[in-house]
């Protein structure tokens, strides 16, 4: 009887552990992906960098992207 209970509980415990681990390991956003709605989801070597969009001096929106930490981007003319 104990063997039947044990063999029933072991697969259940393994499946529960796998599901819990999958929830904790959410997929991170790779470089250059939009992170406006999820700023904490960039991969570990990236940071969610946000930029304001302006038209004729008036702010019209905001864009956020997963970019490399410590890298400065400059506009080219």
Swiss-Prot record:
Q: How is this protein named in the record?
A: U8-lycotoxin-Ls1t
Please give one Pfam family short name. Answer: Toxin_35
This protein's superkingdom? Eukaryota
Instruction: Please give the tissue specificity annotation from the record for this chain.
Output: Expressed by the venom gland.
Under the cellular component aspect of Gene Ontology, which terms does the record hold? extracellular region
Signal peptide coordinates: 1-20
Q: Where in the cell is it found?
A: Secreted
Q: Which family does it belong to?
A: Belongs to the neurotoxin 19 (CSTX) family. 08 (U8-Lctx) subfamily.
**Taxonomic source organism:** Lycosa singoriensis (Wolf spider)
Q: What keywords tag this UniProt record?
A: Disulfide bond, Secreted, Signal, Toxin
- Post-translational modification, as annotated: Contains 4 disulfide bonds.
| Pro-piece positions | 21-26
Supply the InterPro entries for this chain. Answer: Spider_toxin_CSTX_knottin
- Main location class: secreted
Q: Name one GO molecular function term.
A: toxin activity
